[in-house]
């Protein structure tokens, strides 16, 4: 369950970073 929460945060941060680029 902890990995899912980390993946969810990483996915949101990754999408924001990809949109900024």
Curated annotation (Swiss-Prot):
Chain intervals for the UniProt region annotation (Disordered): 1-21
UniProt keywords, alphabetically: Antibiotic, Antimicrobial, Fungicide, Secreted
Location relative to the cell: Secreted
Keyword Secreted annotated: yes
Described purpose of this protein according to its UniProt entry: Strong antimicrobial activity against several Gram-positive and Gram-negative bacteria and fungi.
Residue spans of biased composition, Basic residues class: 10-21
Lineage start: Eukaryota, Metazoa, Chordata, Craniata, Vertebrata
GO terms for cellular component: extracellular region
UniProt organism field: Misgurnus anguillicaudatus
Protein name: Misgurin
GO biological process, one term: killing of cells of another organism
């Amino acid at each position: 369950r902890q990995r899912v929460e980390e993946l969810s945060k990483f996915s949101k941060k990754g999408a924001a970073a990809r949109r900024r680029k």
